[in-house]
Amino acid sequence: MNSIPVLTLLGVTALLPCVPALTCQKSSAQAVRNVAELPLRWWGAGEKTCEVSEGCQDLIMLLYNGPKVNLVIIKGCTEVEDQEPKVIWLRTGPGLSVVSYTRVCRHGDLCNDVNSTKILEELPTPTVPGSLRCPLCLSNDSCENAPEQVCPVGSTHCYDGVLRLRGDGIRTNLKVQGCMAQPDCNLLNGTQAIGTLYMSENCDLIGPQALDCNSGSLETVRNVSDLHLSWTTGWQTCEAGEGCYETVMLIQNGHEFHMVLTKGCTRDMNKKARLTRHRTGPGISIVSYVHVCRDRDFCNDLSTTDPLWTPPPDTELGTLRCRHCLSTGSCVSASELVCPAGSTHCYSGVLSLRGGGVISDLKVQGCISQSQPGCNLLNGTQTIGPVDVREDCGLQLDALKCQHGTLKTIQDISKLPLQWTAGQKICNVGEGCQDTLMLIENGEQVNLVLTKGCTTAKDQEAKVTEHRTGPGLSVTSYTRVCRKKDFCNDLSTTAPLWAPPPVTAPGTTRCPLCFSEQACENAPEQVCPAGSTHCYSGVLSLRGGGIISDLKVQGCMSQPGCNLLNGTQTIGPVDVSERCSPPSETTELSCYRGVMFELGNGFAEEPVKWTAPGSQVCAPDEICQETLLLIDVGQKSAFLGSKGCSSPGAQDNIGVSIFSRLPGMLVASYTKFCSSHLCNGADSSSVLLSILPRPDVPPPGDVQCPMCVELFGSCKSTDSVTCPRGATHCYKGDIALQGGGLTTRVSIQGCMAPPIKPLLGDSKTIGIFSAEESSNYRHEDDVTSAPSLAWTLRLSAWMLGLSALLSSLYAGICPLC
């Protein structure tokens, strides 16, 4: 995405620091005129109240081509820092020449008051005719049958290309033919942006062309009195062959309506604009608009709700009364209303929307008319454009808050009962809260595994299960799933599971005693309690609910065999398995294990140490892996790494991926999957840096962006830094990473260069990590705060063994002025 706001909807405001907002002149224009008309003047610019901290900008560009000149004017609000008036000649001729004027001010309202091209100095110097002849054209339409001109002396080549101009109110493909003093498609001398005007050129017009499409997504709930709505969008350059799509859905429910809008690039076949009325009332009504096109840039240009909505006819009230709600939040305060005549049933359900940048769970309660009651608000529709739609009438309509976190620890039994506190998380609508606790007693030690969080499992009353009671090793678990209230998974102590074991006389069997995620070599022997007849030696693997553990266990048992858990394979969300192959038969694979996150600067230049403090034994279908992700935005860098066992079924492989590079941010990864003993042993980030290209750092350009990388929490940087030349827009987004023992959300701000794509492209996995990217236009309700670890202030740390429970993030809001 570019730096233009993805969607601006009238009436939307934001809480910002208490600084007066400026009023700026607001207008944009593009036109081809005769040079003889210069200097040109303009008047009648509108006015716009900016966001707090924004300034006013003036931007003018003139492209001279013989007797013709193309004029671009942009006035309005901008986040760019103040800039004194600056005139730059991008090309001086002979032949085609380009000059620009830019200024950003904050010293007073309407300070962007330039109203003439006179500010751009003198016209190009007259020249003597030469011998070269070239077509002459400046047109927004076509250059067919363009007249020829005699080029000025010094012109050596004919230029023929399309200049794409993209800015606030400017969406132009300017056809240009004329004289130049050099070959190649370089009319702009490498310039890609002038202020907030983004530019590119294309001189290869044979074959499929990459379209520019309006792009963005929006979800809003409003009063019907706000209709009709209008909007503007951002834009993106598609891959060759892709088309532009737009999808709008309106749900009206009484005096409220819900609107979902998504636009962008697609590989779908062309579809003429189609209006579908999925439900017409009385009561709830639903209409959608779908369009896919390839006939021109920005052909997905619907900008108003006019085609979708007409005021419904007045209807008499009936006798049915239903609760009324249309909300992406809560329906707790929904009121009961009298339905219009013809309504036969009350609807209550959750409409889930996924796709096209839309992630929403809309709670709907209202009146409908249908022959049979049921969960069929959309009359069987399952997709609307790129959006998958699903409804569920069996879920509660409010998202629960649950205690959230994981813990693994080995303690002396004398310390029982243990207590803990947990973080919290907002679940998806329909999910419940779960508590899972497992205790394994072995002599004087106890292994505790705890996981809390959200779950899709059905409600389950608190249940204590004794999987093995001893003598010797004993295993007990506690599981519960609830939805009756927020934070109902409130287990905070081992007390419900544990009571001091009865005193038993010692027996005659002696066995090694071990609890470890590392190794059990040279484990001390213990005298087993009476009744113990065999020694147990195995590896207990736990996977699920945020738990990844391979626990080596040696101790006393009252029966032979590899059956510590008496056949149990799942405990809550955790899958459990055990392996007891004797040493002579073992084919166990050991891998280094640990998670690294480090924040600093210069990581793209100098290697960072990357070693693991421990190892683990993998399951039979797992191999070793190491994954390293580098994010370098210029002034700040971050490394995130994982070593351990892979997901089941992985194959040997080594790879380096570069997702983004200079002149924008550098985002790259190193991954290795291998199947020999401790083969994931890279000890520094040089395994990645040694392969990355080392281009020369470009000189500073014209674009300024905030630069930030945050591993825990959101970027709050407001200071802008000048981007390298070639960067054309600012990026702001989050990347959620999960896997390999790491769960975090990385917040990123920085410079980006064309093509305008997500930072990770289409990548959903990075080695062992699953990755989900969301940019700054994503709906706020869809984002949950990244959990904060108890030792966040240590900017470099390894997570191994005992995991701290997670705590919530809170943010302050400045009062309105």
From Swiss-Prot:
User: Which residue windows are transmembrane per the record?
Assistant: 797-817
Membrane topology per the entry is: Single-pass type IV membrane protein
Keywords from UniProt, A to Z, are: Cell adhesion, Cell membrane, Glycoprotein, Immunity, Innate immunity, Membrane, Repeat, Signal, Transmembrane, Transmembrane helix
Where does tissue-level expression of this protein occur?
Expressed in neutrophils.
Give the observed phenotype of the deletion mutant: Mice are viable, fertile and are born at the expected Mendelian rate. Slight decrease in blood CD11b(+)Ly-6G(-)Ly-6C(+) monocyte and CD11b(+)Ly-6G(+)Ly-6C(+) neutrophil populations. Lymphocyte and myeloid development is not affected. In S.aureus-mediated skin infection, recruitment of neutrophils and monocytes to the infection site is transiently reduced. In thioglycolate-induced peritonitis, recruitment of neutrophils is normal.
Q: Which residues are glycosylated?
A: N115, N189, N379, N566
**Which coarse location class describes where this protein primarily resides?**
membrane
Give all residue intervals belonging to the UPAR/Ly6 domain.
134-203, 322-393, 511-581, 705-774
Task: Please indicate the ranges of residues that lie on the Extracellular side.
Answer: 22-796
What the entry lists under InterPro entries is as follows: Fert-Immune_med_protein, LY6_UPA_recep-like, Snake_toxin-like_sf
**Could you tell me which Pfam families the record lists for this protein?**
UPAR_LY6
| Entry GO CC | plasma membrane
**Signal peptide segment:** 1-21
What SUPFAM superfamilies does the database record attribute to this sequence?
Snake toxin-like
**Record's subcellular location:** Cell membrane
A biological process (GO) of this protein is: cell adhesion
What does this gene product do?
In association with beta-2 integrin heterodimer ITGAM/CD11b and ITGB2/CD18, mediates activation of TNF-alpha primed neutrophils including degranulation and superoxide production. In addition, by preventing beta-2 integrin internalization and attenuating chemokine signaling favors adhesion over migration. Heterophilic interaction with PECAM1 on endothelial cells plays a role in neutrophil transendothelial migration in vitro. However, appears to be dispensable for neutrophil recruitment caused by bacterial infection in vivo.
Q: Kindly give the PANTHER family that the UniProt entry links to this protein.
A: CD177 ANTIGEN (PTHR16529:SF8)
**Quaternary structure per UniProt?**
Found in a complex with integrin ITGAM/CD11b and ITGB2/CD18. Interacts with PECAM1 (via Ig-like C2-type domain 6); the interaction is Ca(2+)-dependent; the interaction is direct. Interacts with serine protease PRTN3/myeloblastin; the interaction tethers PRTN3 to the cell surface; the interaction is direct.
What's the name of the protein?
CD177 antigen
Native species: Mus musculus (Mouse)
